[in-house]
Amino acid sequence: MGKARGDEAYFQRSSLFWVTIIILSFGYYTWVIFWPESIPYQSLGPLGPFTQYLLKHHHTLVHAWYWLAWMIHVGESLYAIVLCKSKGITNTWTQLLWFLQTFLFGLASLYYLIAFRPKHQKQT
């Protein structure tokens, strides 16, 4: 969290709020994709019947969107590496942290990297 050893190692954790929302959403979506028969649809309020409807009438689309979401996260992660290099974040471990965090949490992570403004070195 915050800065460590200057711009070359800048890293900021994503907001706990967004991390929680994304984990719960992707967790539920993964459950729907891989184990739909084990979901207690009646206990989920309006989300249960809606999920059943989507699986029954749009099964292929639900699966396609799931894999598309993961592919988008891969793309965002690769972009995070490019951004790290362009913003002077050269520490390999820090770049890996940005890659992993962006892969797991997408724009909730990438936002902090996009917003980061490195200090410019004075030319002498």
UniProtKB/Swiss-Prot annotation:
Q: Which GO terms describe its cellular component?
A: membrane
Keyword hit for Transmembrane: yes
Mostly located where?
A: membrane
Keyword set includes Protease: no
> Which domain of life does the protein's organism represent?
Eukaryota
Cited Pfam families: TMEM254
Provide the membrane topology annotation.
Multi-pass membrane protein
| Transmembrane residue ranges | 16-36, 62-82, 96-116
**Cellular compartments annotated:** Membrane
State the UniProt keywords alphabetically. Membrane, Transmembrane, Transmembrane helix
Name assigned to this protein: Transmembrane protein 254
The species this protein belongs to is Bos taurus (Bovine)
Encoding gene, per UniProt annotation: TMEM254
